[in-house]
């Protein structure tokens, strides 16, 4: 048994879903201490409450996207990140160092969260980075439009800020272009899929499923309401229906049932949800936010794979949704090639297990006779 500290970005639910999958495997044999914020803290504190004695969830301050008039505000988001780095990151690192020492952590794992990597580095604890965002650094993105390539270069600097000195770097993505020169050490895996997804049996129902982020413009709801099929929307809370659109509170079990049973998705363009959809063979019309470059990149790769299409969230119309629905058969061949074949969970568990084995061997290795053993990270 080992002691593993895990941190993750609290924005949205993709990071939380990915880490939830890992922790479900790790808690069988290890003690796990989780650090997160916002949406992820809400989800994980409930998921690993009573009945999970080997998992503890701690709330920490985190960085969130900033919105103005319902749209992602890149400049305000950057300013908020810089303010977090200047005012909160240092004290948080000091706090986590104390908690790592008290916990006697053997390994740290992070999904795009900046404090734990720094605390682990100072404590000499090996770090495994498992996230989606490292594709901005490691992947050959020459196939994207030049504007998105520029955005990837710009955003890659934030990845450097978040994660320092990782012993192992894993990129989890539903797409897999070649690695850039100098990044051959990165391990590419598919999305990390929770047990409920891998055990779900897909069927083709007579409704659409949609997961939308807060600040979704009402025009997008109107487009869904006039698409010709019932639409179940998650992510915006429970509220009165709008035409054929019904709104549902987040319920993980019910959401998976609807994902497995829907005809298709018209949804936000997060890596995790796209991966879950592809695993179940569901075509997807992604709705990236105009200013959200990562969502735009995910959408381009989805389209290039032939498994779906995309429309800007701010511009989607009922006609665009109906056109997508009329062409669902066009996506069947590509979906058949990935359905049930993209889960990367086992690959990540092997990497973590290997790192723990290396640490255990280093801890029990006899010291050279000529000099005493020195504490330090296991590499």
Sequence positions of predicted segments:
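A short, glycine/small-residue-rich beta-strand->loop->alpha-helix junction that serves as a flexible
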Residues: 7-20
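Conserved nucleotide-sugar phosphate-binding/catalytic loop shared by glycosyltransferases and other
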Residues: 10, 28, 33-86
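Donor-nucleotide binding loops and adjacent catalytic segments primarily
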Residues: 23, 190-264
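A donor-sugar binding/catalytic signature common to diverse glycosyltransferases
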Residues: 108-111, 258-297
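Active-site-proximal region of nucleotide-activated glycan assembly enzymes
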Residues: 126-188
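Nucleotide-sugar donor-binding patch of glycosyltransferase catalytic domains
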Residues: 146, 247-250, 283-328
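C-terminal amphipathic helix plus adjacent low-complexity
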Residues: 322-379
